Amino acid sequence: MMAEVDAQVGRLLTALDELGATDETVVVVTSDHGEMLGDHGLMSKLGFHDQAFYIPLIVRAPGGTGIETACTGGAGQVVEGFTENIDVMPTVLDLAGAEVPRQCQGRSLRPFLDGSVADGGLPDGWRTAAHWEFDFRAWAGSRELDGLDGHLCNLAVHRDHRGKYVHFAGMAPIFFDLEGDPDECEPLGDHPLMAGYAAALLDWRMATDEQELSDHLALPGGMIV
């Protein structure tokens, strides 16, 4: 799989060179999910472990025609802050000089690309945790999940550098102390930080839950944006 991805990305980059478009093109290499590859006895993108959700994100923004200039100051930097795939679209729009819709939940990665934040630093207000959800109804018939109703077969995660909190709709939550257990081998059912992580996860869910009219409020007097 990795050899195939490497070959196809190489074909794309070669074509850009042949077209003379390399210095005018933003290249983003990322993925929609990771791969367990047998870790924790799992395959595919199952579960809540980092292997399934820790994905690559490589951005090259050369600053040529059609791309706002001065976007190479952060070249070669490895960002330790949390990014999410919802950041890709606002980043591309920002680099192209287009307006980013205000309802976008992601943020432009431009500060990391142009070097406006110091190596290892974060822009003001940048997220300090990552979140994800997983629906495992397709595996609800397994022995471990026998009797768990389909609408309860889902989980949500709040993960920062200190720990990971996993909330299940139909089972007890668990916590991983990533300082003492970085490989996530010891799920804890009780930890002093769990209540705070649960509250932070609820805050995120309430702020980002599906909205019929995103970022709009309909009142008798009209629409508030």
Residue ranges of each PLM-predicted region?
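Intrinsically disordered, low-complexity polar regions and short flexible loop motifs
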Residues: 181
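A short beta-strand-to-alpha-helix junction
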Residues: 1-4, 47-53, 66-90, 96-108, ...
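Histidine-centered active-site microenvironments of extracellular/periplasmic hydrolases
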Residues: 14-84
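A generic secondary-structure signal for well-formed alpha-helical elements
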Residues: 16, 20, 96-100, 116-117, ...
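A long, amphipathic alpha-helix that forms part
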Residues: 1-25, 204-205
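Beta-strand elements within well-structured catalytic alpha/beta cores of enzymes
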Residues: 2-5, 9, 26-31, 57-59, ...
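Long, internal low-complexity/basic segments
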Residues: 1, 188-225
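C-terminal cap/loop subdomain of S1 sulfatases and analogous C-terminal strand-loop tails that border
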Residues: 33-39, 89, 94-174, 178, ...
